Amino acid sequence: MEQGVIEELIHLQLPEMEVANVVNVRDGNGNGNDIDGGNEVWAQHQLDNVNNRQMAILLDAPPEPPIVLHQLPQPVNVPQRLRKKRCFWTITKHFHAQPERCALLSNAWQAVQYVQPAQRSEHFANYMYKHMNSRNYPNGEGLPNRWGHF
C-alpha cells in the first residue's frame, strides 16, 4: 500500500497586534526621563534604526541559521596519539619461577610442613644441624656456595 505525499497550503489567519517600540534615550542629567537636555542626535539615530526596515529585519533575524545535520562535515579518522611508554621499573609482573634453592633447604622445607606451626622454627634448626654434615654432602657438594643460594 503506497502512500502519496499530499501538498496543501495551509493559511492561518493571525490576529493583528500592535507593537510598541521601546527606545532607550540618554538624558544629559542622568535621570533617563527626557531627551531635552540629552544627546538629541543619538536619540534620533536610535529612532531611525527602529523605523528603518532593513535594520528591523536584521534585529528580528535569529542569531544563527539552524544547523542541518546532514550537511555537517563527517569527522576524519585521525590515528590516536601513542601513549607514553611506562618506565621499566614501574612495570611489575608476577614471577612464577621458583627461586633457586639448594637440596638441603628444599628437603628441610618439606620436612617442616608436617610439623605444628608453633614448633616449625625449632624443627627446622634441628633438621639443618642433623643433616648438614660431610656424610650427606661429601666435599660440600649440594650445599649453598654463595649468598642467596638458599
UniProtKB/Swiss-Prot annotation:
The keyword Transmembrane does not apply. InterPro entries: Soti. Keywords: Developmental protein, Differentiation, Spermatogenesis. Pfam families: SOTI. The keyword Plastid does not apply. One of its GO terms (biological process) is sperm individualization. It comes from the Eukaryota. Belongs to the male-specific scotti family. Post-meiotically transcribed gene that has a role in late spermiogenesis; required for actin cone progression during spermatid individualization. This is Male-specific protein scotti. It comes from Drosophila grimshawi.
